[in-house]
Amino acid sequence: MRILCLDIGNSRVGVAISDPLKITAQPVMTIELRNKDLFEELDKIFQGYNIEKVVIGYPLSKLHPDQKDEKLKKIDEISEKIGSRYNVEIVKWDERFSTKAVERVIDEELNWKRKKKIIDKVAAVYILQGYLDFYNGS
């Protein structure tokens, strides 16, 4: 059984998956939302892997706890659909600063277009690895 991670953005979704022992996270893909349907792509992923849980990168807001911005509402809506469609546990994991941390690590030599594709899936790896480390008590 594996854990899938999604880093949901406005135009792209970074996807990462754990190894079967749930120790390490690997990048899977970046889904370009303007060109592809998120759930068609997720259907393929769920068919290819035995997934028991989905970790969703959740940008904990600086707003009052009772307030949610549009991005959080979108993530909540997608999370609910994923949970019911695939009958999996959903875990929302703090992803604040994950993209910024990954941007610092990625080689500055990459052109911006290539960098954007890599950043999203590597951000998903960063989020999932943080969750796996917590999950495994590391």
UniProtKB/Swiss-Prot annotation:
GO CC terms of this entry: cytosol
Keywords from the named record: Cytoplasm, Hydrolase, Nuclease, Ribosome biogenesis
SS bond partners: none
GO biological process: rRNA 5'-end processing
Cell location: Cytoplasm
EC number(s) stated in the UniProt entry for this protein: 3.1.-.-
An annotated Gene Ontology molecular function: nuclease activity
Gene3D superfamilies, A to Z: YqgF/RNase H-like domain
Taxonomic superkingdom: Bacteria
Cross-referenced NCBIfam families: RNAse_H_YqgF
Assigned protein family: Belongs to the YqgF nuclease family.
Function: Could be a nuclease involved in processing of the 5'-end of pre-16S rRNA.
Protein name: Putative pre-16S rRNA nuclease
Species whose genome carries this gene: Caldicellulosiruptor bescii (strain ATCC BAA-1888 / DSM 6725 / KCTC 15123 / Z-1320)
